[in-house]
A protein has these predicted regions:
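Glycine-rich phosphate/adenosyl-contacting loop at the front of the ribokinase-like
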Residues: 1-60, 65-69, 75
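Short, flexible active-site loop motifs that bind/organize anionic cofactors or intermediates
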Residues: 56, 94, 113
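General structural feature for long, well-ordered alpha-helical segments within catalytic domains
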Residues: 66, 70, 119-122
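Short secondary-structure transition/capping segments
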Residues: 68-71, 94-97
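A glycine-rich helix N-cap at a beta->alpha junction
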Residues: 73-89
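Conserved phosphate-binding/catalytic loop of the ribokinase/pfkB sugar-kinase fold
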Residues: 85-87, 97-123
């Protein structure tokens, strides 16, 4: 079987669910908070692994709890993590996602963290 290599970003998704997305300067009460894996490249690699693909994911994460979440998930799916760099000086990226539970609309703020420092030399 051939290997599927995916180059991309892992971020920890911090989802905040409420009846609306707050407007500028507004504070609202939410109904739910969910933390889970995210990042477009990571999501593609996970999908390929769940379809029994042999996957190699290329990214950079921090040496922290969010990076640990990524590695635990990838290992559980049997993905090759040899191309994942853990940077002890950078944190793993995060995405703050506000979701309107009535409409499904969202607003997202992404901090790429370690993945934003990936260079050609790293690859």
């Amino acid at each position: 079987m051939k290997t599927i290599s995916v180059f991309g970003v892992f971020v920890a998704d911090l989802c905040f669910i409420a009846n609306a997305i707050p407007e500028k300067g507004q504070t609202i009460l939410g109904s739910q908070h969910i933390v889970g894996p995210g990042g477009k490249g990571s999501n593609q690699a996970i999908a390929a692994a769940k379809l029994n693909g042999r996957v190699n994911f290329i990214t950079k994460i921090g040496n922290d709890k969010n990076g640990e979440m990524a590695l635990n998930l990838y290992n559980a799916l049997g993905m090759n993590t040899d191309s994942i760099i853990q940077d002890k000086n950078q944190s793993t990226g995060v995405a703050g996602i506000m979701v309107n539970e009535k409409t499904g609309d969202n607003a997202i703020n992404i901090i790429p963290g370690a993945a934003g420092t990936l260079t050609n030399d790293d690859i």
